[in-house]
Amino acid sequence: SDLTFDQRVIALRMALKIDILPRLSFALMFPVGLELSAALGVVEPGLATRAISWSVSALWVVIVIGMVRAREPARARSLKHANVVLHWVLFLVVVAIGLTSVLGHGPFPAGWLGWKILLFGLIFFCGIMIDREFDPVSPAFARLAAEGSKPDIELAIKSAIDRSIVWVLTLYVLVVVIAFLGTARPS
């Protein structure tokens, strides 16, 4: 890399701080979307659906903020694990809701909104994979700090980032398609 170790540490810290905004936005996306859909008359969610949606979102926001603020490694690991478990549960639940809706048996209309929910569920999988592929960066950075730059360390960092970027781009494509479906509402 053309950057010094200290510059790379600063860049990584900045990236991790910036990363909180899309994570918080993602945590709020479903309940806000549900409320907007209700306001537009597209869906009529019951009080229980709204309460569950907002409660899960609030829990998720607490986990995300906790992950960023955790100072003790054990607490950070615990919150990260909770985040991964929540992502897997939400992936399965939202994909199931989207799929049953697309097939005409779910809580949402089968057309564009069913597809939007299904694709939204796939974003959870992208988030899981982004985190999983990025995981090797931390131990590689620790080695970089201890041993200095070596080809295998640089390769580990570059490979992890490159694999993460594939999932980030996939997530962006899903967001664009979801935005199109919500805007165009094709029949």
Say what each PLM segment does.
Residues S1-S187:
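Polytopic transmembrane helical bundles with strong interfacial aromatic enrichment
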